[in-house]
Amino acid sequence: MNAVNEMAVPFVFTDNAAGKVKELIEEEGNPGLKLRVFVTGGGCSGFQYGFTFDEEVNEDDTTMEKNGVTLLIDPMSYQYLVGAEIDYTEGLEGSQFVIRNPNATSTCGCGSSFSA
């Protein structure tokens, strides 16, 4: 497990995102849950982001803790998320987790996939 400290963090996990994840974990009633962010092949631009709750931390995961919430990223996804910001937004169009990724050379119209 590779823990990153906030001074040398290669990605940003915003207070809004951590707060929403904490709220969702409390709703689940399982304080052992962690947020796993990952990149998979697919979508119209080649890659897409995924979010899931996980109780297990794999040996090669990169972990980050913010406001009592642990974020997990596997090594394959890590390379695509360096420099990215993981945020949660609420607006007229609804609420959603958003990844602002400087490594994405293009994104699709729906915003759920990207190419790098």
From Swiss-Prot:
Binds 1 iron-sulfur cluster per subunit. SUPFAM superfamilies: HesB-like domain. The keyword Iron applies. Coiled coil: none annotated. Its cofactor is iron-sulfur cluster. GO terms for molecular function: 2 iron, 2 sulfur cluster binding; 4 iron, 4 sulfur cluster binding; iron ion binding. Keywords: Iron, Iron-sulfur, Metal-binding. It comes from the Bacteria. Disulfide bonds: none annotated. It holds the Pfam family Fe-S_biosyn. Iron-sulfur cluster binds at C44, C108, C110. InterPro entries: FeS_biogenesis (IPR000361), FeS_cluster_insertion (IPR016092), FeS_cluster_insertion_CS (IPR017870), FeS_cluster_insertion_RrpA (IPR023063), HesB-like_dom_sf (IPR035903). One of its GO terms (biological process) is iron-sulfur cluster assembly. Required for insertion of 4Fe-4S clusters. Belongs to the HesB/IscA family. PANTHER family: IRON-SULFUR CLUSTER ASSEMBLY 2 HOMOLOG, MITOCHONDRIAL. Homodimer. HAMAP family: Fe_S_insert_ErpA (MF_01380). This is Putative iron-sulfur cluster insertion protein ErpA. It comes from Dechloromonas aromatica (strain RCB).
